[in-house]
Regions:
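Flexible, polar/acidic helix-loop-strand segments at domain edges
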Residues: 241-312
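Alpha-helical solenoid repeat scaffolds, predominantly canonical TPR units
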Residues: 61, 68, 115, 152, ...
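Polar, glycine-rich mid-to-C-terminal structural blocks
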Residues: 105-107, 143-243
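Short coil/linker segments at helix-helix boundaries
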Residues: 36-58, 109-155
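Long, intrinsically disordered, low-complexity segments
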Residues: 64-66, 87, 123-140, 144-148, ...
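Conserved, well-structured interaction surfaces
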Residues: 1-34, 49-85, 281-307, 315-318, ...
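Short coil/turn linking the two alpha-helices of tandem helical-hairpin repeats
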Residues: 31-38, 80, 102-114, 325-330
Length: 444
């Protein structure tokens, strides 16, 4: 460590904590997408003698970054505890939450290269892989996870429990799910500190959040030449119908109307079941600083909308998952968190349906693990989380197949359709769609 760091100033220790987290986050994103990669902890030499490196085992990389994250936590303040440490800076809450996320991936399933890194007693193969389509070994590539996966799940549970149970924890669920997205689009901080960390962008300088995905708006409608809400990222009717119709999150995850000129300028309902827009980003929620630039822009203008890396419900759901998978049950209360796995899940669902709603307890229709799998889909739609979750659970192939079958049955119209925890009959899907406009005849 440098002389400045060793001097013991709290500022230098905070900077060290931020640096450790950012490096760990970078390697984490590489490893969970690419597996075994080149890895080094020191600086590159001026003669480039340590630049060209071979791959090393992902388990070794995970072990290193977990250790770094554990160190970083000790140096970091809670959000708001020190001036300028807001959701755009690395803070204690995010570092602990990120360590939990890293630990779950470190202990999760992934495709492994058995030729370069042969399986041994430290690696556990996917059970009954040859009888599980999509999970069988192919050309020495196999699905595996570390044999000590429970150690990582213990880390995840502990870190989440410490956040939940700490009286100094400043993070809470925003009571209004829509407020999360209206605030971030408007370049405002979340009042409840729900967002543990946001990648900071600047209007006119960086960030295509909203222009590449979000509620669709055509160009040349009085707000500038360019439109908003592209289809670079979109979803489909299968995901829409997975929601309970009373779930407050549904119309933020899936948004059918397009704002365009159809006689007059208004929203028009589209019915492409394979291309449903994400509703979490809207031009009409953006900051005036962005709109004023967009009004005269001839090319795509960076919105400045921050990308939310982690929200507080992730802490609750990771806690619930890790505790349950460690065999501690869904109803036993954690001494550290002060709540059970089931209660953590219910807190997330209470916001979606309202406290006291009978729908909050509908998760009991399925196994608790399946309830967690479903809840994470509904809570984090369009946030870049689902695919990677399914990989670490070993469920990516089977969930894709379930979706394909369901959508074929939806189009066929002669079979019951299973979508998540719901069974639909063909006649439940409408042939005609009725909707109404607001008092101005502009928005549905």
């Amino acid at each position: 460590a440098s002389e400045a760091f060793n001097s013991g100033t709290t500022a230098m220790r905070r900077y060290m904590g931020e640096a450790l987290v950012l490096r760990s986050l970078s390697y984490f994103e590489l490893v969970r997408r690419w597996g075994d990669i080149p890895f080094k902890e020191g600086m590159s030499n001026s003669d480039l003698s340590n630049v060209y490196m071979g791959k090393i085992n992902r388990d070794s990389i995970y072990a290193c970054i977990v250790k770094d994250m554990q160190e970083a936590i000790e140096y970091l303040p809670w959000v708001g505890e020190v001036a300028d440490y807001n959701s755009e800076r690395i803070t204690k809450g995010f570092a602990k939450g990120m360590l939990a996320r890293i630990a779950l991936f470190a202990g999760g399933w992934s495709v492994r290269d058995g030729k370069e890194f042969p399986a041994n007693t430290s690696v556990e193969r996917y059970p009954n892989a040859e009888q599980s389509p999509g999970m069988e070994e192919v050309g020495e590539y196999f699905i595996g996870r570390p044999a000590n996966w429970r150690d990582y799940y213990e880390i995840a549970e502990q870190q989440c429990a410490e956040i939940i149970g700490d009286p100094e924890n400043p993070h809470r669920l925003d009571p209004d799910y829509g407020d999360i997205w209206k605030s971030v689009c408007g370049l405002k901080a979340n009042t409840y500190n729900e967002n543990l960390f946001e990648v900071a962008n600047g209007v006119g300088y960086s960030g295509d959040i909203g222009t590449l995905m979000g509620r669709a708006m055509d160009g040349n409608l009085g707000y500038g030449q360019r439109g908003f809400g592209g289809t670079y990222v979109s979803t489909n009717a299968y995901y829409f119908y997975s929601f309970d119709q009373n779930d407050a999150r549904r119309d933020y995850a899936c948004y059918w109307p397009v704002y365009k000129k159809d006689g007059t300028i208004k929203e028009v309902m589209q019915n492409d079941i394979m291309s449903v827009r994400l509703g979490k980003w809207s031009f009409f929620w953006t900051a005036e600083s962005y709109r004023s630039i967009a009004l005269t822009a001839t090319a795509r203008t960076p919105t400045g909308i921050n990308w939310i890396v982690m929200r507080y419900p992730d802490i609750l759901l990771m806690f619930a998952e890790a505790r349950y998978m460690l065999g501690k049950g869904e109803n036993s209360v954690s001494d550290v968190a002060g709540i059970s796995a089931a209660r953590a899940l219910e807190m997330v669902r209470e916001r979606a349906f309202g406290s006291g709603s009978e729908a909050v307890m509908d998760y009991k229709k399925v196994d608790f693990f399946d309830a967690i799998v479903n809840e994470r889909a509904w809570e984090f739609g369009g946030e870049g989380i689902r695919k990677l979750d399914l990989i670490r659970w070993g469920l990516l192939d089977s969930k894709i197949e379930e979706m394909k079958v369901a959508m074929l049955y939806m189009l066929d119209g002669s079979h019951p359709i299973q979508i998540f925890d719901k069974t639909y009959q063909p006649e439940e899907f409408p042939n005609k769609l009725y909707f109404k406009y607001d008092e101005n005849g502009e928005f549905i």
